[in-house]
Amino acid sequence: DFDIDLTSVIKNIESEENVEEDEVTVSKSSSLYKNSSDASTIVYPNETYGKVGFSSIFTKSGTRYKLINKDVLTSDLQKYSSKLYTLLQMVNKYNSGNVFIYSNYVSYGGTTLIKQLLLANGFYEYSSKNPHEYKSFVVFDESTNIKNREQYKRIFNSDENKTGKLIRIIIGSPITSEGITFKAVRQVHILEPYWNMSKINQIIGRAVR
């Protein structure tokens, strides 16, 4: 069996980064913070995380990813990521109800990974031409063009979508943390919580008014 010692993983990161024992604060932009965050989200079968780990189970062609080890995100998910396993359990607990999933990041351990997690577990990227009732999601991050952002927000907030029939899940990055309102949301999941409670409340405020 494959056992993950997350404490050991993070200690190794700190050692590699030469972090001083008396250091009190760590910049959110530092590689230590990002690596620790990646490792806390998922550690892959080869005991890697972040970009290296992500690349071990996906191949990329252009802008599209292909999952080459599906078990990691499906049947074996709980072994490699209790966080993502719990997220999926909560989303699947109900057959309807709008969901907002927030990540600080886009690449590898962020919105890209959440998208692939949902695709591997029976959800579909929203398409007006090929709808999947209560099983569709959209990605609302820096890679989403402005026109599509406005369209997704309008559809998600429409009366017809109060229970998630058209778009059930929005996967959002920091561009959703201010000035945007998502209506009729029943679940809010923040993948990487901030130390600052006001920032967490700000994110929750996108969906709770």
Roles of regions detected by a PLM:
Residues V188:
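Short conserved active-site loop signatures built around small residues
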Residues N196-R209:
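Conserved SF2 helicase motif VI
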Residues L191-P193:
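Conserved AAA+ ATPase "SRH/arginine-finger" region at the nucleotide-binding site
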